[in-house]
């Protein structure tokens, strides 16, 4: 198991890679589907295979609350529970504790909080997070960190970085599932020197890969790129780099140009549930009246199950009637669209044409 760089772009930091996990090989750069509660919303595992999904992301916080560690242990882990044979990455639960949970109380050991579901009290820290991820049996586990909001003042960012580093050290020392890789998470907000400090300290601890956290939390796009630029130079070249919570096509392409290999986001499934289709040339509101009589596919040239078999008119009809099939078809399309985009991106790196690919992506955005 490990990460191998197969080819590098001559004009940018984009690289083509291969990440080997206990449940299979992942071609990078990769977009990972979010399956918060052990399911990518509206999709079956066979849909994920057909849409060329490579990795599913599970959320430790949500899985800890329900179904809980006892149920997952009885099932033999999340792979068996959800019948997904491919790689699974789990986040640590830190983001959800800081963004969803109520009545938070911090200590050096972690965070005591009340569930957003029923108010029941829980405690989650680096030891508890890694123990839960061991039960889940994910191929890649993330260290427990403190995810900062935007904006955030320097004093809080500095104390958060120190805590994130301490928690990373504790996380690294916990028992892991067999074959489980562990990634560190760089924090530091918009402060370049803090991100450098965090990255360098995490590298000293030593991890199988490194994530750039605290981005895509409401900051301007230029601040997101600044955070990536402030982190990547201090991360090992021979380890995968992962920007958390990012799933917009042009933003992923820009980050790949900066040397990033992995991404995840709820965008493709979430906007599908609101009637929006992802296409190479931009998002399309399928609920719009202009598609009432349109007999073309959701996206011309798309080979997903939805576009091969159904029209914009029909999908719009389903959405207008609140039929579950409409959400499912549009989710299939959106997940396929992002995975196709990443496959095309990888091929452009392989063919030494990433610069042209990036220029085309930028032209669609503009």
Give residue spans per PLM region.
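C-terminal extensions of enzymes
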Residues: 1-18, 26-30, 42, 145-151, ...
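Glycine- and acidic
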Residues: 150-151, 158, 209-215, 324-327
């Amino acid at each position: 198991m490990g990460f191998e760089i197969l080819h590098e772009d001559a004009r940018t930091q984009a690289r083509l890679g291969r990440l080997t996990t206990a449940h299979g090989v992942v071609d990078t750069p990769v977009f990972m589907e979010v399956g918060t509660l052990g399911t990518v919303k509206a999709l079956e595992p066979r849909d994920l295979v057909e849409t060329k999904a490579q990795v599913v992301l599970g959320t430790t916080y949500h899985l800890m609350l329900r179904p809980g560690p006892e149920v997952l242990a009885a099932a033999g882990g999340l792979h068996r529970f959800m019948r997904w044979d491919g790689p699974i990455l789990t986040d640590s639960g830190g983001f959800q504790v800081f963004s969803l949970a109520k009545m938070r109380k911090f200590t050096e050991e972690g965070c005591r909080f009340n569930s957003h579901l029923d108010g029941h009290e829980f405690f989650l820290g680096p030891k508890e997070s890694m123990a839960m991820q061991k039960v889940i049996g994910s191929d890649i586990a993330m260290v427990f960190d403190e995810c900062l909001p935007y904006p955030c003042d320097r004093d809080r960012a500095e104390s958060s970085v120190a805590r994130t580093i301490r928690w990373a050290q504790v996380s690294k020392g916990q028992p892991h599932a067999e074959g489980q890789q562990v990634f560190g998470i760089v924090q530091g907000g918009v402060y370049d020197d803090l991100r450098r400090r965090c990255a360098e300290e995490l590298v000293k601890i030593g991890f199988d890969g490194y994530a750039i956290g605290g981005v895509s939390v409401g900051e301007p796009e230029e601040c997101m790129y600044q955070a990536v630029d402030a982190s990547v130079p201090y991360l090992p070249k021979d380890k995968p780099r992962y920007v958390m919570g990012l799933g917009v096509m042009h933003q992923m392409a820009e980050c790949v140009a900066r040397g990033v290999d992995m991404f995840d986001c709820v965008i493709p499934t979430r906007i599908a549930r609101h009637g929006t289709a992802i296409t190479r040339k931009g998002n399309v509101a399928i609920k719009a009246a202009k598609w009432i009589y349109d007999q073309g596919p959701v996206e011309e040239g798309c080979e997903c199950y939805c576009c091969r078999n159904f029209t914009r008119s029909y999908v719009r009809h389903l959405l207008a009637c609140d039929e579950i099939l409409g959400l499912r078809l549009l989710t299939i399309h959106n997940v396929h669209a992002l995975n196709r985009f990443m496959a095309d991106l990888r091929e452009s790196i392989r063919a030494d044409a990433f610069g042209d690919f990036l220029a085309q992506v930028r032209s669609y955005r503009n």
